[in-house]
């Protein structure tokens, strides 16, 4: 067995969330997030030759929420509470959804045909304050705070959206059931 490190250990690197499609169908490219001088950015890592290509710029890039489309032609990602579709070749992007003021969006899930995305939106003023005890402690505090969360269903082609479910409960990890875009799986977080 041969184990090969893919990233430079001096650079903080994340892979995408485990249910996100982070590799191309042919296994050539892997989506990663790295924190370098310009902050956190998304990159494609060529698994055949090790070449790393930066594909985003600016602040507020979601560190683990990007994913390839089923046909590998589009990369979906989040930046500053906006959700984008990027052409994987040209890197041309367009925003198809923006989270409303006062809310933060996260945990995207895609339909099998990449037509629909589900996300969790959390009302920011219902979250506990970040007092420096970040990390896993924040999970327990967030669960106890019972923040106002909602699951939003977005049509990627038109940008139209609607709230599917809203409650004072911490939601996470939305996934649209394969081949059934009318069923959304999600997590009620906690207790921690």
Task: Label every PLM stretch briefly.
Residues 26-27, 39, 72, 113-114, ...:
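Conserved loop/turn motif of beta-propeller repeat scaffolds
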Residues 13, 18, 62-64, 104-107, ...:
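Conserved positions at the start
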Residues 28-33, 75-78, 116-120, 182-189:
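Residue position within the beta-strands of beta-propeller blades
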Residues 58-150, 159-166:
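Asp-box/WD-like beta-propeller blade repeats and closely related beta-sheet repeat scaffolds
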Residues 1-15:
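A short helix->beta-strand "capping" segment at the edge of beta-propeller domains
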Residues 23, 68, 110, 176-178:
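Residue-level recognition of a conserved intra-blade site in WD40 beta-propeller repeats
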Residues 163-192:
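Beta-propeller domains
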Residues 12-20, 37-83:
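Blade-loop segments of beta-propeller domains
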